[in-house]
Structures are given as C-alpha cells and as structure tokens.
C-alpha cells in the first residue's frame, strides 16, 4: 500500500476525488472541493480517509 503525500490527488468511496491536505498515521485529510459536482453532493469541504480506502490518481506537483 502506497501512502499519499500532501498535494496528491486521490480517489475514494465510489469515485470521489480530492487533494490530500494532511497525512496522519492511519489516514489522510482530503479537500474534496476540486470536484465539479462538489456542491451538488452536499459534502463537507474536508473529509478523513483511511490509508486502506483510497487510490492515488495523480502525484503532487
């Protein structure tokens, strides 16, 4: 399992995507406001995702 770094774009939970804001021991904090349909989904802007539950789709810049 590859652990994401700050700035990575990850995919999790039924195709949601977001940018990693902080890396913790067992999880990452993700900003999901990059999604085009963010407002339609009525999500909070930040969410916590366990390392086991995401896939890195783009490395940080």
Swiss-Prot record:
From what superkingdom does this record's organism come? Answer: Bacteria
A Pfam family found in this protein is DUF2187
Q: Mind telling me which InterPro entries this protein's record contains?
A: DUF2187
| UniProt name for this protein | Uncharacterized protein YkvS
Q: Which organism is it from?
A: Bacillus subtilis (strain 168)
Q: Which gene encodes it?
A: ykvS
